Amino acid sequence: YYTYLELDQDQNGMLCAAELAKYGEGGLTMPFVARVFQECNTFCSPASQQLEMDYKSYLEFVLAMRYTQRPEALVYFFRLLDLNGRGVLGAFEVNYFFRAVLERLIELDGEPAPCQLEDVKDEIFDMVKPAQPHGITLADLVDCKVGHTVVGILTDANAFLAYDRREFNMHEPE
């Protein structure tokens, strides 16, 4: 509850997209946050005419973020990532969300990430090993056992950096 209060900078009891974007370490991308507000239960503020999230919707978001390995969380995220509601994440969706991660990395670090969009898209498809090569279904995402990693790569610049630096971090002395 304290995190919710800290995020609620205008202290109106609701969170707007800009406030929610500061969740965690501030690595969430705006296209992902926009999808949260498009797909989850939100309210239109009469004063600002923008969508805002109440505490109940925030709790659903937090539970999904904290327990990304759970199938229920993957259902939550899949709904957000599936832009057209087709039940498939194709190259377009992967590129759309990862492009935003690359942009967020520039905002945070001031320099581009040392990777190519196509390489990461191919790596995600290799990780998931979808039953059909044209796209990733919810079942593929759950069954692959790395769905949480894929969600992080597509939604959060900090999660992508952690994934990208995983081998380096494994060899760091403590």
Residues of each region from the PLM?
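Structured alpha-helical bundle/scaffold domains in large eukaryotic membrane-trafficking regulators
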Residues: 19, 70-77, 93, 106-113, ...
